Regions:
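Short amphipathic alpha-helix adjacent to the substrate-entry channel of hydrolases
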Residues: 100-119
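Glycine-rich His-Gly loop
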Residues: 91-95, 163, 226
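Short conserved active-site loop signatures built around small residues
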Residues: 18-85
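N-terminal Sec-pathway targeting helices
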Residues: 1-18
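Gly/Ser-rich "nucleophile elbow"/oxyanion-hole loop immediately N-terminal to the catalytic nucleophile
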Residues: 80-86, 128-168, 175-179
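Short beta-strand element of the alpha/beta-hydrolase
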Residues: 83-94, 107
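Alpha/beta-hydrolase-fold serine-hydrolase catalytic core, especially in secreted/extracellular enzymes
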Residues: 266-268, 274-329
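The feature captures the conserved acid-bearing segment of alpha/beta-hydrolase catalytic domains
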Residues: 182-282
Length: 329
């Protein structure tokens, strides 16, 4: 049983590597202007795919004695002269995709008025590095010598992550001691329980710690994936016994639905898949609606919220998206 899962995973690793190479190629070619080449549909997705109004600055801090090496914090440059607090988004890294490789995504989110905090952890699935990153930015909020002194809106903190980082984001909220400080989450292409089962059997840095449990989520949650082969696979159910030619995707539709159903119905929750997009492209392709999600929950932007809620929620009829399910109690 494990053999077939791992054979499928070997194929998926090749596909995922191709997705990562594609993402790197896009980043190298388009750099910080990736959003100019996006293809959003609908007024809300289009608006929040573009840059916000803020110029962005970066502060870096060493994290000696840790596997994540340093903390990187992107923030609106106006913060340095402002007397108001800014909401925070922590980003949990996907496998090998540390913050320094995805600067454009951090900068984009910060341009919309967020303090965006990350690190160099390449194995973020437990949520430990995200928890440490949150603790660090909160310590700066209490430090009179820091530019962030009194500038962190501690009542409005969100977290996002892609792939392994999706698992890390969920675990940061549900398993870490400071998880109760988060107000909203966006988990992208979160590694499924079937793939997690196989990965948990491995030795070394990739072995163990891959499970996450959305039953414990009590904050608004937006979970996304793609319809491409690496994310979707070709098995439509949670099944470990696979026949030849069958592969479990990293984040298939059955997993999104399982995560959605596991979350309490008292919690606002949305799932959806990006049509024609695969695993490596999700962080860029979902960026507009991820930004809108956090603007609504952390900044009270009602226009952004109309992407998800109400009779005319834009994401329902957006040609870029399919398999959308919304619960807004």
């Amino acid at each position: 049983m494990i053999k077939w899962i791992l054979i499928g995973m070997a194929a998926l690793i090749g596909l995922t590597a191709a997705g990562v190479v594609l993402l790197a190629a896009i980043a190298n070619h388009k750099g910080a202007n990736y959003w100019r080449f996006a293809e959003p549909q609908g007024a809300i997705e289009t608006r929040y795919t573009g840059l916000g109004e803020y110029e962005v600055s970066l502060a870096e801090f060493d994290a000696p004695g840790t596997v994540w090496e340093k903390y990187e914090i992107w923030y609106p440059s106006d913060l340095e002269q402002s007397d108001k607090p800014y909401p925070v988004v922590v980003i949990a890294n996907g496998t090998g995709m540390k913050a320094s490789k995805l600067r454009a995504i951090y900068e984009h989110l910060a341009s919309w008025g967020f303090i965006v905090a990350g690190n160099e952890d390449e194995h973020a699935r437990t949520g430990a590095s995200s928890a440490a990153t949150l603790d660090f930015i909160l310590s700066l909020n209490d430090d009179p010598q820091s530019v962030f002194y009194g500038r962190v809106d501690t009542e409005n903190i969100g977290i996002t992550g892609h792939s392994q980082g999706g698992v890390g984001a969920v675990n940061a909220v549900t398993q870490q001691k400071n998880g109760n400080l988060y107000k909203a989450i966006c988990a992208q292409s979160t590694t499924s329980s079937a793939v997690a089962y196989a990965l948990n059997q491995l030795d070394g840095e990739l072995g163990g710690g891959w499970n996450c449990d959305t039953t414990a989520l009590s904050i608004p949650a937006f979970m996304v994936a793609g319809t491409g082969t690496a994310d979707a696979g070709n098995v439509e159910e949670n099944r470990l016994e696979l026949a030849g030619g069958e592969t479990q995707g990293i984040c298939p539709l059955w997993w999104l639905r399982e995560c959605f159903d596991a979350m309490p119905d008292t919690v606002p929750k949305v799932i959806g898949r990006l049509s024609g997009r695969d695993h490596g492209a999700i962080p860029i392709s979902a960026d507009g609606y991820m930004t809108a999600w956090f603007l609504y929950w952390l900044q009270g932007d009602e226009a952004a919220g109309r992407a998800f809620f109400g009779a005319d929620a834009e994401i329902r009829d957006n040609e870029n998206w399919q398999d959308v399910t919304i619960n807004f109690p």
